[in-house]
């Protein structure tokens, strides 16, 4: 009888130990072995390459480490003209990413080695800090020969001294680069080019590439002016539609007199010619009889 009791006690102890391990398991596991670590790294770890064009190294509020511009002293010119201005839509800590820039009088760009296949996103950061009207600086952006941004006019998009991000998703699989509905052979490097156009020089303020999708990209702060403009455009479209509807109804009313219903008219109008004819026939017959 003692053995069964001992066996029963051992089983209870094992059950208690198992329950304790289940409760403390998440705390005992190290970081990176949990569910989040298994699903994927955080935003800073997802960024495979980042550059503060025309500026020094910087770590933004999301933890992304932007390295110093590798083109310094090699290609184009660096400018910190934007340091004089506050940049809308950007946090105060990260305005430096939009206040410095690199531009060139000819097409220029960056080379980024990519070792692993998968989904990636190229994020380009811009701010117009010099020109105060549109059609003063317009250029294209190419990625491995594909035009991913056409006729970029920063001022026309967001106005002066305002942050603007261009977000370009892409995928690299089986030696092929897919972007903007086009496919090309991928040889291990991404070539990001800022193409000289007819209006001034191409430029960029900062840029980075992350492994992930557009949903992983931090969004800029809302632009009150742009939101108001969009709301006004929507209201104008609604008003125009309402006016068009009212005008259409009005035109339908004024399109002409309604056609009378012949079946609804009074039959007495048909008796008038008969009475006239009868009135003429009686006197004529009387005259003929007297003859």
From Swiss-Prot:
Glycans are attached at residue 267. GO terms for molecular function: carbohydrate binding; enzyme binding. Residues 1-30 form the signal peptide. One of its GO terms (cellular component) is endoplasmic reticulum membrane. Residues 290-291 are cytoplasmic. It is found in: Endoplasmic reticulum membrane. The chain crosses the membrane at residues 269-289. Residues 220-264 are annotated as: Disordered. Residues 31-268 are lumenal. The keyword Endoplasmic reticulum applies. Coiled coil: none annotated. It is a single-pass type I membrane protein. Residues 244-264 have a biased composition (Polar residues). Residues 230-240 have a biased composition (Acidic residues). Keywords: Carbohydrate metabolism, Endoplasmic reticulum, Glycoprotein, Membrane, Signal, Transmembrane, Transmembrane helix. Interacts with the oligosaccharyltransferase (OST) complex. Belongs to the malectin family. Carbohydrate-binding protein with a strong ligand preference for Glc2-N-glycan. May play a role in the early steps of protein N-glycosylation. This is Malectin. It comes from Mus musculus. The lineage of its organism: Eukaryota, Metazoa, Chordata, Craniata, Vertebrata. The gene is Mlec.
């Amino acid at each position: 009888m003692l053995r069964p009791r001992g066996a029963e006690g051992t089983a209870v102890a094992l059950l208690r130990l198992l329950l304790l391990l289940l409760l403390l398991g998440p705390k005992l596991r190290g970081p990176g072995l949990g569910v989040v670590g298994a699903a994927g790294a955080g935003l800073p770890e997802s960024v495979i390459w980042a550059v503060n064009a025309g500026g020094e190294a910087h770590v933004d509020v999301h933890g992304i480490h932007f390295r110093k511009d590798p083109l310094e002293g090699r290609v184009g010119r660096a400018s910190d003209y934007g340091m004089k201005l506050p940049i809308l839509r950007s946090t105060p800590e990260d305005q430096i990413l939009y206040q410095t820039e690199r531009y060139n009088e000819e097409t220029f760009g960056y080379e980024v080695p990519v070792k692993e296949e998968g989904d990636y996103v190229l994020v380009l950061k811009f701010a117009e800090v010099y020109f105060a009207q549109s059609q003063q600086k317009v250029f294209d952006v190419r990625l491995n020969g594909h035009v991913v941004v056409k006729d970029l006019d920063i001022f026309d998009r967001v106005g002066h001294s305002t942050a603007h991000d261009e977000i370009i998703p892409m995928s690299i699989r089986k030696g092929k680069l897919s972007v903007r509905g086009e496919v090309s052979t991928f040889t291990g490097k991404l070539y990001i080019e800022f193409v000289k156009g007819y209006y001034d020089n191409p430029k960029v303020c900062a840029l980075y590439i992350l492994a992930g999708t557009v949903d992983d990209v931090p969004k800029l702060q809302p632009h009150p002016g742009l939101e108001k403009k969009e709301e006004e455009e929507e209201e104008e479209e609604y008003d125009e539609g309402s006016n068009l509807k009212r005008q259409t109804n009005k035109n339908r009313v004024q399109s002409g007199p309604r056609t009378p219903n012949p079946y609804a008219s009074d039959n007495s109008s048909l008796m008038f010619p008969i009475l006239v004819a009868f009135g003429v026939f009686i006197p004529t017959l009387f005259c003929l009889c007297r003859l």
